[in-house]
């Protein structure tokens, strides 16, 4: 209906005028919203001017009355009443000459008075439907549906407003309004159904459409005359009376419209007309036509027990069909139409006959209609199963985590204990399924641990089928618990699942019984992907890399050396290797040069023949020789000579194992160049030289390559250089991308406009063309890594991803397959290192102490690939701003959804019952503002949700404790206590909550019933009932990380540590005033590796010594301590590797004494803001120290001289310390470098006298203004040492 633009213009006018009033407030906005709603409803009635019923019942009178009201202001009403109302309202509402309240009150009074007058004489339309002579254009179903949509939109406004200060607020329960809304929506579905199914318009259809229009208009009038109560200040009708009015209206709908014309007769007539000519169904989504909504209409409220079975089946059909495209059905759509129409005829006939005779039975209806319900129910049953199973199966993602069976087996065991009554009828079948899955666990383990076996494809196909069956079992078991599927259907479905699992096992057993000789056959056929490198291709960039590699080839060790070059696809590894291989200065130093390209799938014989051809020439007779003779021939050919071999594109270690025996080592400086995408292969092949990870291009190299490829030997025009530089930068430093774009530019006119167009569209072109290369790397990923890799598509562009968070998400998503004796986190780290080794993931940060990856990110090309491929695989779907919810019907179900706004989550929630993960990604990367978001009612639709990661961006009003499948929850809260119902989330493994403000959060004792918790992170929490915690004997054996409990007493800390015996990381805050002697040593869990301890009150003494035999990382902050305390603590921390002291004051006249043997394994010592003057360190202390960092230790006199003699020391950093500390640091550097030849040593000085020298790079950097003479002295001194 064409009123949106006018209303939008009207709203803008309101806003313009309200800005002119002295006070701009929410009240003003509420008034504007009120008037807009009133006018939108009136607009609906104005579109009914051509209908007789609208005139006879008085609907048009009220519109005319409004026009007459306009005339009272001595201004003739314009043709467009809306334009006139807009002008009038602006004058009355916001006139400067009168108070805004006066204008508002006046206009509201006029509206309400008119409603009162009309309500007294309004009645339901009584006109005979047959007498309604209307134009075809007005009675078409499109108009009826458009009118119903407008009414639904107006009612939705009243339902959604929960703010009592709004003039549109409706107090009390809104169930009646919601029921009316449902009726209207189902009526629209019925109209759409009839419209889509009828071939030619008939009398029955016209009658039905008119009736639908009468019902919708009457609903709109009843609501408009009586609601909203606050806005109209309705004193004569209370909210309860309005609800009663609506309820009475609902009952009236099933009565006769007038004698001789029954509503049910109209529906029966139209359904019988459709039944006689069921057309070929359109191949569209079933939900678009409301194909099964009609029989489950609210008329079924009064159904007798005889119809209950039919109602149950039809509801199941409706609920499952809504997500299923017609094209995926395994039967004719006409069959479903026939079933639905028959069911509708049964229902409406039942009501029609019940109206005539109260004791009407089902048999009476069957005789009247001429068919048997019992017989007709059977095809409905069959159809229901087909639809339900197909709807579920077609919505499953095609990529799965192999750890899903682990999760299912644990839940099946728990379910049988928790819901024994629900499982009573199906216990035997479920136990059979449980045993079958347990028997398949060894097979899944082999798939993960031996991904490159001969039957890789078959193994992965079987593994995916197993995981899909696990998802199906979860769905059926949940339906068993929640009574979502009748028992007659569950039994058959479970039996079919058992049969399917048996078939999968037979396939696996058949694979395992293949003849042993077949198992040893290496499926290495000639690859169509193998390529011959271009020998003379000129390389641009990597000048420094080439020089280093040339030096390794010509010099270095006398023994054989394999120089491995690895990096992601498109970096230019092959081009770089061929540049060296064809370099005359290199080739001239070798007796034999030979090369081969291995590729992903290769023939061992072909590789040997290629190398022999380069070494001794072509000989066709060699192809007839067996592989072992060819290998021996090659080895003998190379044995006495110095050789250079290029082995390009090696994909796995086994390929290198096949070839390495052919390359003898006789200490004659023979060299092998090997290129690979995978770090693990490069490392495996390296002998003396470290693998070279080929970097990306820098800015200058990117531009030079682009210019070279586009202009050849010529230079770029100055007019094009700016846009050219921008294009080169947008290529992401990837040589392959640069070459692809250069190919596009070479074919275009050398005009700025053309290049600008390329720059604007660069992302799409680059990524589409690069996809084939990335796709090849993805294709060869083992099954268990594919889901891990695609999951990166859930992160934002250039986002630095915290590894701890990533691994927790992977585990919660069941991507990690368990292995006996190994932690899931350790296995996940191995998965990540594998992806890094394949150059699919870039490391952005590693831990200084152990080198473990702490953060990573994906290159844009790879990120886009992950997003696109994940969507294709039904794995992950991004829902962005303003994306239509109608798109859900054109997509299958996705296992994971990433939203950019909470509003999108609200709109899509109704279509996400099978979604497993919801991830909120805020592009602004900052917390969204309060107030708290009401989330509980939305998440009820996500019944299988396992991951809810709101990234601390959204404040939620409550914790969704109904989602018992949930394994990962991350959000922000504003409550000061966690509800005891949190224990309902008995599958929860990771709970991360952040508070909007700094306060203590009370944790209920029921948390200790959540035995699957692995990671618990809540700021400043304390037990709500310490006595209950003490009495509760449960322990969280699986809990590994805990932050941040607040301990006011040592006893509290002792208690919590006893409850968490397997902690590995603890961040806590303590406020212990005094420490009793019996607690002199606080024993932390034996597995604890990381401890961060903060004092709530600065510079109080830590009242206990820390005992943690396996602690590796300790951070103490805001404390007061002495040498004795640290000495006694050190005695209990023999394996400590990292010690960080922040804001610490020392007693004993600000002195710290470190005795011999203290901190024997310490590698990193960081001291920041220490109140320390004198530091005395024994000669044998810190024997393995590698890094010393001093920040803001302004009172410290010097660094102890014994640091000069620590052989492991590599790095000292001094920031904002006094001059004597800087001098002592430089003296340590001098001794380390000159006396001990420690060329790896690096000193960084920041702040006063900030002169930084890097001995390895022979570089000096001044980071602040320093006296020039002093800089000169430092430079001369460093030059004498050969350091610059």
From Swiss-Prot:
Coiled-coil regions, chain positions: 533-555
Gene: R1B-16
Protein name, UniProt field: Putative late blight resistance protein homolog R1B-16
Keyword flag Endoplasmic reticulum: no
Chain ranges of the HMA domain: 1217-1284
UniProt topology in membrane: Peripheral membrane protein
Ligand binding (ATP): 567-574
Record's function text: Confers resistance to late blight (Phytophthora infestans) races carrying the avirulence gene Avr1. Resistance proteins guard the plant against pathogens that contain an appropriate avirulence protein via an indirect interaction with this avirulence protein. That triggers a defense system including the hypersensitive response, which restricts the pathogen growth.
Protein species of origin: Solanum demissum (Wild potato)
Note: This protein is encoded by the haplotype B genome of the allohexaploid Solanum demissum.
Pfam families (UniProt xref): LRR_14, NB-ARC, NB-LRR, WH_DRP
Entry GO MF terms: ADP binding; ATP binding; metal ion binding
Subcellular location per the Swiss-Prot or TrEMBL entry: Cytoplasm; Membrane
LRR repeats: from-to residues: 942-966, 985-1010, 1013-1036, 1085-1107, 1108-1135, 1159-1181, 1182-1206, 1219-1243
UniProt keyword list: ATP-binding, Coiled coil, Cytoplasm, Hypersensitive response, Leucine-rich repeat, Membrane, Nucleotide-binding, Plant defense, Repeat
GO cellular component: cytoplasm; membrane
Any one GO BP annotation for this protein: plant-type hypersensitive response
């Amino acid at each position: 209906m064409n009123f949106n633009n006018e209303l939008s213009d009207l709203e803008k006018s309101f806003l313009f005028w309200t800005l002119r009033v002295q006070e701009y407030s929410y009240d003003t906005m509420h008034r504007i919203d009120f008037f807009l709603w009133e006018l939108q409803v009136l607009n609906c009635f104005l579109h009914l001017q051509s209908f007789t019923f609208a005139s006879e019942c008085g609907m048009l009178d009220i519109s005319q009355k409004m026009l007459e009201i306009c005339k009272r202001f001595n201004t003739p009403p314009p043709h467009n009443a809306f334009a006139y109302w807009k002008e009038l309202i602006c004058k009355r509402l916001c006139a400067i000459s009168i108070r805004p309240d006066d204008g508002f009150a006046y206009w509201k009074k006029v509206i309400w008075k008119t409603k009162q007058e009309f309500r007294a004489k309004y009645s339901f339309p009584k006109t005979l439907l047959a007498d309604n002579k209307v134009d075809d254009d007005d009675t078409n179903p499109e108009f009826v549906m458009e009118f119903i949509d407008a009414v639904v939109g107006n009612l939705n406004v009243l339902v959604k407003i929960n703010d009592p200060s709004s003039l549109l607020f409706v107090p009390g329960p809104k169930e009646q309004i919601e029921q009316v809304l449902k009726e209207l929506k189902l009526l629209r579905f019925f109209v759409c159904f009839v419209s889509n199914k009828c071939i030619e318009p008939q009398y029955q259809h016209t009658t039905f459409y008119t009736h639908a229009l009468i019902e919708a208009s009457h609903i709109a009038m009843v609501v408009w005359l009586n609601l909203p109560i606050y806005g109209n200040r309705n004193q004569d009708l209370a909210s309860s009376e309005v609800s009663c009015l609506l309820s009475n209206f609902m009952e009236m709908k099933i009565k006769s419209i007038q004698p001789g014309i029954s509503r049910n007769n109209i529906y029966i007539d139209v359904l019988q007309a459709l039944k006689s000519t069921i057309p070929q169904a359109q191949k569209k989504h079933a939900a678009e036509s409301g194909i099964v909504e009609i029989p489950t209409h609210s008329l079924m409220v009064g159904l007798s027990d005889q119809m209950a079975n039919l109602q149950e089946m039809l509801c199941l059909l409706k609920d499952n069909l809504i997500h299923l495209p017609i094209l995926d059905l395994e039967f004719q759509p006409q069959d479903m139409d026939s079933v639905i129409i028959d069911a509708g005829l049964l229902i409406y006939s039942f009501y029609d006959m019940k109206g005539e005779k109260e004791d009407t039975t089902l048999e009476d209806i069957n005789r009247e209609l001429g068919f048997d319900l019992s017989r007709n129910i059977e095809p409905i049953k069959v159809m229901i199963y087909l639809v339900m199973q197909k709807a579920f199966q077609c919505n499953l993602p095609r990529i799965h985590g192999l750890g899903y069976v682990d999760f299912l087996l644990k839940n099946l065991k728990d379910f049988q204990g928790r819901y024994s009554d629900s499982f009573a009828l199906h216990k035997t079948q479920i136990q059979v399924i449980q045993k079958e899955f347990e028997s398949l666990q060894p097979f899944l383990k082999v798939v993960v641990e031996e991904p490159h076996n001969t039957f890789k494809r078959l193994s992965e196909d079987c593994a995916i089928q197993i995981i899909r069956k696990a998802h199906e079992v979860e769905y059926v078991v949940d339906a068993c618990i929640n009574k979502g599927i009748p028992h007659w259907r569950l039994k058959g479905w479970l039996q079919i699942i058992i049969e399917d699992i048996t078939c999968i096992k037979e396939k696996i057993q058949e694979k395992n019984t293949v003849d042993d000789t077949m198992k040893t056959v290496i499926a290495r056929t000639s690859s169509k992907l193998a390529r011959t490198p271009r020998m003379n291709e000129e390389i641009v960039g990597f000048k420094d890399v080439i020089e280093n590699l040339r030096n390794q080839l010509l010099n270095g060790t006398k023994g054989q050396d394999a120089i491995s070059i690895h990096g992601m696809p498109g970096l230019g590894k092959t081009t770089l290797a061929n540049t060296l291989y064809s370099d005359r200065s290199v080739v001239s130093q070798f007796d034999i040069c030979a090369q081969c390209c291995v590729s992903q799938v290769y023939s061992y014989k072909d590789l040997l023949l290629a190398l022999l051809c380069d070494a001794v020439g072509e000989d066709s007779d060699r192809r007839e020789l067996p592989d072992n003779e060819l290998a021996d021939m090659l080895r003998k050919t190379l044995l006495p000579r110095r050789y250079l071999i290029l082995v390009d594109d090696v994909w796995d270690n086994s390929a290198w194992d096949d070839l390495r025996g052919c390359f003898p080592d006789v200490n004659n400086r023979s060299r092998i160049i090997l290129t690979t995408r995978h770090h693990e292969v490069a490392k495996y092949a390296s002998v003396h030289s470290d693998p070279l990870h080929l970097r990306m291009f820098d800015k200058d190299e990117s531009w030079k390559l682009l210019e070279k490829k586009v202009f050849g030997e010529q230079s770029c025009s100055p007019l094009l250089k700016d846009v050219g530089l921008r294009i080169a930068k947008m290529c992401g430093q990837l040589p392959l991308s640069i070459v692809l774009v250069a190919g596009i530019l070479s074919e275009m006119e050398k005009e700025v406009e053309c290049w600008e167009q390329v720059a604007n569209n660069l992302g799409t072109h680059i990524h589409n063309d690069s996809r084939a290369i990335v796709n090849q790397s993805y294709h060869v990923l083992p099954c268990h890594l594919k889901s891990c890799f695609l999951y990166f598509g859930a992160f934002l562009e250039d986002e630095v991803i915290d590894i701890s968070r990533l691994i927790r998400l992977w585990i919660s998503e069941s991507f990690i397959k368990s292995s006996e004796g190994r932690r899931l986190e350790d296995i996940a780290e191995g998965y990540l290192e594998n992806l890094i080794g394949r150059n699919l993931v870039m490391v952005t940060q590693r831990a200084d102490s152990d080198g473990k990856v702490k953060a990573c990110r994906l290159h844009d090309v790879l990120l886009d690939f992950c997003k696109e491929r994940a969507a294709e695989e039904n794995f992950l779907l991004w829902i962005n701003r303003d994306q239509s919810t109608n798109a859900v019907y054109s997509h299958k179900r996705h296992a994971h959804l990433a939203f950019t706004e909470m509003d999108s989550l609200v709109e899509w929630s109704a279509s996400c019952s099978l979604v497993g993960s919801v991830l909120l990604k805020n592009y602004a990367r900052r917390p969204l503002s309060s107030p708290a978001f009401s989330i509980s009612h939305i998440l009820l639709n996500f019944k299988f949700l396992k991951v809810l990661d709101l990234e601390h961006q959204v404040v939620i009003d409550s914790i969704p404790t109904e989602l018992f499948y949930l394994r990962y929850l991350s959000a922000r809260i504003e409550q000061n206590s966690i509800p005891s119902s949190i224990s309902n989330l008995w599958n929860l493994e990771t709970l991360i909550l952040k508070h909007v403000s700094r306060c203590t959060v009370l944790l209920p004792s029921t948390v200790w019933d959540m035995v699957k918790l692995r990671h618990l992170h809540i700021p400043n929490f304390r037990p709500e009932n310490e006595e209950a915690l003490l009495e509760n004997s449960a322990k969280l054996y699986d809990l590994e990380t805990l932050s941040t409990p607040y301990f006011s007493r040592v006893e509290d800390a002792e208690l919590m540590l006893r409850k968490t015996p397997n902690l590995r990381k603890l961040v806590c805050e303590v406020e212990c005033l005094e420490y009793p002697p019996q607690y002199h040593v606080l024993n932390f869990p034996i597995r604890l590796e990381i401890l961060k301890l903060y004092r709530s009150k600065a510079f109080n003494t830590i009242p206990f010594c820390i005992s943690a035999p396996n602690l590796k990382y300790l951070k103490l902050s805001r404390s007061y301590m002495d040498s004795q305390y640290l000495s006694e603590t050190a005695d209990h921390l023999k394996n400590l590797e990292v010690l960080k002291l922040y804001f610490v004051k020392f007693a004993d006249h600000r002195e710290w004494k470190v005795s011999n043997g203290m901190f024997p394994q310490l590698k990193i010592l960081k001291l920041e803001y220490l109140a320390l003057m004198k530091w005395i360190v024994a000669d044998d202390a810190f024997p393995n120290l590698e890094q010393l960092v001093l920040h803001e230790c302004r009172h410290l006199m010097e660094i102890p001289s014994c640091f000069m003699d620590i052989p492991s020391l590599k790095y000292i950093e001094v920031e904002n310390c006094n001059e004597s500390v800087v001098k002592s640091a430089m003296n340590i550097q001098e001794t380390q470098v000159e006396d001990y030849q420690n060329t790896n040593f690096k000193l960084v000085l920041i702040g006063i006298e900030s002169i930084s020298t890097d001995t390895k790079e022979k570089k000096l950097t001044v980071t602040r203004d320093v006296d020039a003479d002093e800089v000169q002295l430092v430079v001369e001194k460093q030059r004498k040492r050969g350091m610059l």
